Amino acid sequence: MSLQTIGIAAVAVVYFLIRYFNRTDIPKIKGLPEVPGVPIFGNLIQLGDQHATVAQKWAKKFGPVFQVRMGNKRVVFANTFDSVRQLWIKDQSALISRPTFHTFHSVVSSSQGFTIGTSPWDESCKRRRKAAATALNRPATQSYMPIIDLESMSSIRELLRDSANGTMDINPTAYFQRFALNTSLTLNYGIRIEGNVNDELLREIVDVERGVSNFRSTSNQWQDYIPLLRIFPKMNREAEEFRVRRDKYLTYLLDVLKDRIAKGTDKPCITGNILKDPEAKLNDAEIKSICLTMVSAGLDTVPGNLIMGIAYLASEDGQRIQKRAHDEIMKVYPDGDAWEKCLLEEKVPYVTALVKETLRFWTVIPICLPRENTKDIVWNGAVIPKGTTFFMNAYAADYDETHFTNPHAFEPERYLTASSDGSGTPHYGYGAGSRMCAGSHLANRELFTAYVRLITAFTMHPAKRAEDRPILDAIECNAIPTALTTEPKPFKVGFKPRDPVLVRKWIAESEERTKHLN
């Protein structure tokens, strides 16, 4: 065989290999702007490790909705408030499913199954989501306020102790990770972690769930988009290690609950109610999925928002917000009973606005969990075929200058007026549409209660050392840019009790009210 023939054959092989590895799951969508990429990788290299800000910049050139190639997957990005509202809310019946990804769905989730939020839409997902939504709706949430009473009190009690009555600056992260996680564990299993913020089980769950969150991220695993990379064992080894560690504590928590049910010592909880209901229509795999969802969701939204909300309140600009919030709380509760009344009602509009602005400004899930359309969707005349993956750029939408006035400023006041800022859908901090966060009512009450109690108990101020102060930027504050959710970089805050005697009195009252939960 001549060298020329060998050369032609080699070129042909390379050509067909490139064509094979360069193909996409969905052909190019006609009529929809496309960001130019490179063979095989598509736009992965250009997107880098900050997909939200890169896509936000592209939107200025290619329009609010465009298509990209991420390896062999074609993805449609929506980057403005109105484009998300059109696709995620007005077209929500079509945009109801989720795509599957190799690392999270085939490796990490091979033993426990998928969370509700990461499951493709089918009858099983419908049953699981209905069960979770019923357990987390507004009336049900009110019945959980004793749990929030206990967990918020526990965090504030330890902040008071560990800050030596406000004389030492302190990192609030672990306190409010436990606040959110214990709330979820008590709701789902009737179990709480009773140790301090350094408890071994608490740290293990937080560490593993943060790791698993990275595998759920749309930007962290190139092997999800380039199948050839899956042949390298290191790509799967870390995911498998996290799966084993997660299996251990999920099995432990469920076994403890089942043992308590058998002994008649269990406390009312979501999974316990299902296990004891002879008419429950959920099988073992579906029950595991609900458990998985409650554990992971407890750390997804509330801790990052609350921790960074505290960071802003403690900043120099945050002093004005603290003062107004405290003044507004005192107007409604001049007798100093806000600590207890915030469990029963939500009657301080400024604090409600503060919660909304926290969720918008920090947008702790910058690129929401992806969606997949179950039928064709039309956008500006372009037909986006069934089975296409969609990414909501929640960060870009929540910072959309055509919708929000001065979006880069932290201004709770924007939600006190009937302007475009304050009316309709307030933000995309919980996603949107048919698969938005089912626990949003619970999360709102957690944030509202924590804010009322923190602001009435303490004045929060900048750390004494400049190097301990937080980064007050929603993207730059993230220690892991490719993670699904914001992992705040370490920082410290000063917590000075307004009236130590009164704060201890409130703590003692909460301890008495919630002693049955311990």
From Swiss-Prot:
What InterPro entries does the entry give?
Answer: Cyt_P450, Cyt_P450_E_grp-I, Cyt_P450_sf, Cytochrome_P450_fung
The organism's superkingdom is given as: Eukaryota
The UniProt entry's GO biological process terms, in alphabetical order, are: penicillin biosynthetic process; phenylacetate catabolic process
Catalysis: reaction(s)? 2-phenylacetate + reduced [NADPH--hemoprotein reductase] + O2 = (2-hydroxyphenyl)acetate + oxidized [NADPH--hemoprotein reductase] + H2O + H(+)
Give the EC number. 1.14.14.54
Give the matching Pfam families. Answer: p450
What outcome is recorded for mutants in which this gene has been deleted?
Answer: Increases penicillin production, probably by relieving the competition for the precursor phenylacetate by the catabolic homogentisate pathway and the penicillin biosynthetic pathway.
List positions binding heme: C437
| UniProt entry keywords in alphabetical sequence | Heme, Iron, Metal-binding, Monooxygenase, NAD, Oxidoreductase
Regarding protein family, the annotation reads: Belongs to the cytochrome P450 family.
Q: What is this protein called?
A: Phenylacetate 2-hydroxylase
Originating species: Emericella nidulans (Aspergillus nidulans)
